[in-house]
Amino acid sequence: MKKKSLTELISDLKGNENVVNWHEIEPREAKTRPMPESIDERIKAALSKRGIDELYTHQYSAFQYVQKGESIVTVTPTASGKTLCYNLPVLQSIAQDETNRALYLFPTKALAQDQKSELNEIIDEMGIDIKSFTYDGDTSPAIRQKVRKAGHIVITNPDMLHSAILPHHTKWVSLFENLKYIVIDELHTYRGVFGSHVANVIRRLKRICRFYGSDPVFICTSATIANPKELGEQLTGKPMRLVDDNGAPSGRKHFVFYNPPIVNKPLNIRRSATAEVNELAKEFLKNKVQTIVFARSRVRVEIILSHIQELVKKEIGTKSIRGYRGGYLPKERREIERGLREGDILGVVSTNALELGVDIGQLQVCVMTGYPGSVASAWQQAGRAGRRHGESLIIMVANSTPIDQYIVRHPEYFFNRSPESARINPENLIILVDHLKCAAYELPFRADEEFGAMEVSDILEYLQEEAVLHRNGERYHWASESFPASNISLRSASQENVVIVDQSDIANVRIIGEMDRFSAMTLLHDEAIYLHEGVQYQVEKLDWDHKKAYVRKVDVEYYTDANLAVQLKVLEIDKTKEKSRTSLHYGDVTVNALPTIFKKIKMTTFENIGSGPIHLPEEELHTSAAWLEIKTADEDIGEKTLEQLLLGISNVLQHIVPVYIMCDRNDVHVVSQIKAAHTGLPTIFLYDHYPGGIGLAEEVFKRFSDINEAAKQLITHCPCHDGCPSCIGTEIEGIKAKERILQLLDQMS
């Protein structure tokens, strides 16, 4: 049978009735500038061997700004040569003066390893003795000593910087005395709690640099987000120059939204996205068109992989289709990456591990199983197809979830608007106090010293009263025997964490993670299904007193969702927007939450297939919230009906908030109350699910009119009769729920 070309397959797809939007991105010519004359001849020769004799405009701009001592954030698409934006000035600096040093921060170990091998290839071709080392948990003690003394370029991650480098800075004197550049790659991944912690780690890093007499320039790179310059400045505390004049070429891209057919009309349930992805990928692979499939979890990766291998084993054999996810050994991952670059591997099914800048060469087709959760992630994944020249195809196959349905019905949101803003709150008191402890352990604090832009004398006095610090004249010294960084996780806002223990293999019981207490109530109760790096675990026992959750690997087709009985108390109102019938506020609240029952929800249809009780004590959370009060409701709506309508609105808002604010669905909780304690009015609260808040609720307050408009659009365009899991929740009998909810949302806008 004659193989079809990609062009023919694209033409066939145009006739598919499930294609709901077809967006074409025109090809773009390269925009280049000559190689700057100041660049060392050995670097020019090494780049020339790799076919690089000119620079793209963004690489040229980045080099010029950094040479002037400006800190920069470079924002260009995947595979546009961002790495040269930092490698070039760093290598130039060390070629000019071999005492100069650079620190590279990557969010994952895999990415650090990948960048190290690319960097070492250039260094080898330069013929200069520049030593670059990765420094992570796998680095052997013998190598560690070498890195500290002789590493020109130290490649690590924020967790190692926080717990292994900064507390032992006296062993790293040659790095800190001569540190010229700090590179932060994949800046957009530093958001929420993690980003708020990392901003404080950077404050500690800058403090130690000042102590050793260095003032490094920051070179950041980011995927496309709405606020890269602002995020870079918040994270580093330095003014940033934005470099976004992308000069890299790209071929024609077809970006297709595909909505599976409805199989249950009353409930508006569609055929599973996984089944559609299998069929679509099969067509490309059997015609030998190199394809990448993205799935949200490891379990889904393995399911799709086995299905596709089965579907195409006669045509191309199973060896040329591989899975790729965290948990694979580095050797195996390198082999898959090489196979993709060289064309021996035709298809790969991956979690978002391949979203970040690992070099896998040029693929022709990218298929996404569902919306990846943010516009930035979707564009990162799309960038994996047609990385250099030639035509490419991206297909996003929608799930039945409200957020997926909103995206495929509103392509203009996806293609025309700026993507989401990444939010951090380095001043979160719990996070800030933790890092002040670490900073005081590293170097004594002067009484008048600032940390970031904050005066911290009150906090230092408090820590002295708690006997954590000891004051001697004008300085505060660390007074405790303990080592603070080892007890502080960068992934959690509160350090009173529940440790998650995997006992799937009794001979190899291991800790796989931790979670703050407040989240653990709803995500780690007995019988909960917990997802860790895409693997499903069931909680066999939550030992609340000793803060341990014992889990075992399972493979099930449902997830669990806990009901919380929530009492909210408003502590302080900071901002208000008044409308004739509603008021929108932002401020501080306490949340008293008691988990009551959990439900088992089927992944494909969102049906409730079982439930059980949760026996845990009440917990209190101090956080920030945005809340909307309805001052006057229509008189013909009874209290019971209004309560149901508020629940419906809450369901929609819970799904829509992550479309506008870069966060996961569980980061902002939505709770409705028919009579709020402080006013007696019907109220919907949207609160940060982290102690102290991390800036998400404030962003909800700022962007509420956009969020409200999106909620109305979602309900209006949902084809169900009067409510379904894809919009306001299951049907509310006999009250014209959709119509009335739209009226209420109109009053709020």
Curated annotation (Swiss-Prot):
Residues 63-243 form the Helicase ATP-binding domain. InterPro entries: DEAD/DEAH_box_helicase_dom, Helicase_ATP-bd, Helicase_C-like, HRQ1_WHD, MZB, P-loop_NTPase. GO terms for biological process: interstrand cross-link repair; nucleotide-excision repair. Keywords: ATP-binding, Helicase, Hydrolase, Nucleotide-binding. It holds the Pfam family DEAD. Residues 276-430 form the Helicase C-terminal domain. Signal peptide: none annotated. The keyword Nucleotide-binding applies. ATP binds at residues 76-83. SUPFAM superfamilies: P-loop containing nucleoside triphosphate hydrolases (SSF52540). It comes from the Bacteria. GO terms for molecular function: 3'-5' DNA helicase activity; ATP binding; hydrolase activity; nucleic acid binding. A motif (DEVH box) lies at residues 185-188. Its EC number is 3.6.4.-. Belongs to the helicase family. This is Uncharacterized ATP-dependent helicase YprA. It comes from Bacillus subtilis (strain 168). The lineage of its organism: Bacteria, Bacillati, Bacillota, Bacilli, Bacillales.
